[in-house]
């Protein structure tokens, strides 16, 4: 059927509820809007679903959630592990509780038990719950840091990580095979509960999760010594982090935690920010205002699903510095690996894991501590996959993993990035350095002096709709057919094409495999430890240009990064 026929089917079929039909009636005269909503199904990709909330096959609604869940249920039933059940969590967004219940009711109608959190919870706790409850899978209703009109649906497998091969393709195929909405199963929530197929979970999982985080503390002595003096400003950005982040800090002994009141309570409209993203300066405006009032040492903000952490740290002159995800990740990697090395030594087969778009300072840290370094595709699920590989092969030990987009994992209690454990560890590190009369900024400067003045940045273009998607593909194909030989004065040493699974040495012409799964990503290794990577976003209508350089000082790094940024923008303009 064409999009107009599908639109009419949704308008007239008794299966669809009155609110859905009323919403569709309101767009009856808007042909473009009808087409956008019905020209395709909302794609269930490797990251699950993510889209604008609304009626239509290309929108997030109870029917597209039911379709995704029916496909997942079919896959689970074929796997033979349906009796293990599925854990379900949700965030503070519009319709998140409703979508979580819809998923649970669909699973129950298929004979699969759902364990549903009683209220909003962080993404990492869902990952932990899958493992703790020994479920076959997990569902998380969240769109992370997207604008308020979005919501999403992420699927986790039994190891607690987001789905990777072969499960991702298997589930995607099952979801695609569900073509008739009226055949999808569901049942009333009360009936599911009465049948023992819908169990509400909460405090017992919270307590176990917090206990796991506490196991990662290295220097409780430092917290005991100065934790009561350290001043911390924290914002959950209207999301899920408020209760667990403040709980862990209080229980460890951090007494001066100031929450940003305007952003404390869950609110899917995110009224104080246009974009609830801890990478954005806007997200810190209220936090920094409070920090200056109370003279805080550090300012922290977690994104709405509390898997990513933004950081500002105060130097000894009272100035606050923004730590990018690369900087905070390296600060934590150096602290965690360095302190464990000093206290009890490191395992011979220990590994630091990073994504391909993450700073090369990580490589320098791994070299310094003589640990292995593993590079994976963008997406924390690939770090989770490596941890599973260590466990199943009994070879290799996880030390730390992070990605440039403000996410890391300390410990293996979860298999997704965890901003609650990161909040805990960063405050612990601040306490430790405070006992040495150092700030976190002092520690960062010390790292630059030891490893090099690395600076990394990103430029992105937003291209929405059908035409935008085509343009994004055109940009990648143009670069693929005409690879640059020089970028911003840096020679291209190697060109990696993850879609073609090739690494070409630009000097010798030799071609080798990337050793990673195929992905529509281009990467250029440049001279002087610089690099550039181009990839479409997996969650937003964007194409992203990541790049990094290494300078001889902070000012030199700033200059080189600015020059690289200008060159990247010029490249984009030329292609566009």
Where are these regions (language model features)?
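Conserved phosphate/anionic-ligand binding catalytic regions in large, soluble enzymes, centered on
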Residues: 38-58, 143-146, 232, 236-248, ...
């Amino acid at each position: 059927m064409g999009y107009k026929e599908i639109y009419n089917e949704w308008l007239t079929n008794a299966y669809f509820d009155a609110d859905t039909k009323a919403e569709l009636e309101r767009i009856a005269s808007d042909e473009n809007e009808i087409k956008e909503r019905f020209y395709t199904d909302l794609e269930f990709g490797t990251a699950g679903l993510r889209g604008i909330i609304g009626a239509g096959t290309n929108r997030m609604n109870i029917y597209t959630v039911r379709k995704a869940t029916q496909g997942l249920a079919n896959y689970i039933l074929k796997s033979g592990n349906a009796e293990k059940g599925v854990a379900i969590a949700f965030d503070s967004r519009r319709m998140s509780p409703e979508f979580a219940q819809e998923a649970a009711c669909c699973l129950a109608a298929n004979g699969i038990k759902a364990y549903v959190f009683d209220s909003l919870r962080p993404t990492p706790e869902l990952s932990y719950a899958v493992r703790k409850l020994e479920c076959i899978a997990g569902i998380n209703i969240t769109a992370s840091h997207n604008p308020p009109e979005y919501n999403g649906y992420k699927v986790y497998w039994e190891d607690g990580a987001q789905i990777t091969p072969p499960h991702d393709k298997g589930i995607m195929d099952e979801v695609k095979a569900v073509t008739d909405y009226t055949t999808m199963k569901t049942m009333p929530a009360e009936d599911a509960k009465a049948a023992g197929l819908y169990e509400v979970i909460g405090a017992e999982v919270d307590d176990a999760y917090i206990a796991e985080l506490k196991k990662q503390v290295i220097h409780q002595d430092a917290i005991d010594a100065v934790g009561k003096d350290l001043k911390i400003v924290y914002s959950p950005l209207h999301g899920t982090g408020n209760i667990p982040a403040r709980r862990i800090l209080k229980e460890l002994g951090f007494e001066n935690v100031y929450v940003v009141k305007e952003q404390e309570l869950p609110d899917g409209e995110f009224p104080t920010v246009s974009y609830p993203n801890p990478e954005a300066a806007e997200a810190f405006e209220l936090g920094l205002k409070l920090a200056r009032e109370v003279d805080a040492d550090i300012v922290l903000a977690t994104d709405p699903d509390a898997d990513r952490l933004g950081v500002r740290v105060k130097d000894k002159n009272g100035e606050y510095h923004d730590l990018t995800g690369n900087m905070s990740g390296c600060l934590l990697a150096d602290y965690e690996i360095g302190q464990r090395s000093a206290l009890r030594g490191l395992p011979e087969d220990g590994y630091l894991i990073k994504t391909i778009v993450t700073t090369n300072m990580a490589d320098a840290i791994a070299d310094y501590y003589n640990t292995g370094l593993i590079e994976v595709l963008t997406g924390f699920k690939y770090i989770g996959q490596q941890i599973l590989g260590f466990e199943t092969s009994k070879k290799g030990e996880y030390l730390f993993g992070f990605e440039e987009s403000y996410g890391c994992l300390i410990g293996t209690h979860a298999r997704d990035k965890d901003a609650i454990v990161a909040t805990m560890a960063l405050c612990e590190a601040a306490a430790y350095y405070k006992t040495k009369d150092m700030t976190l900024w002092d520690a960062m400067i010390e790292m630059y002096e030891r490893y090099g003045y690395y600076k990394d940045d990103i430029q992105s273009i937003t291209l929405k709709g059908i035409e935008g998607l085509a343009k994004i593909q055109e940009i990648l194909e143009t670069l693929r057919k005409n690879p640059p030989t020089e970028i911003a004065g840096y020679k291209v040493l190697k060109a990696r094409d993850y879609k073609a699974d090739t690494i070409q040495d630009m000097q010798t012409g030799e071609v080798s495999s990337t050793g990673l799964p195929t992905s529509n990503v281009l990467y250029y290794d440049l001279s002087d430890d610089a690099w550039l990577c181009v990839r479409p976003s997996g969650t937003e209508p964007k194409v992203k240009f990541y790049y990094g350089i290494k300078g001889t000082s902070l000012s030199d790094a700033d200059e080189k990064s600015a020059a690289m940024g200008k060159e990247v923008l010029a490249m984009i303009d030329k292609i566009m």
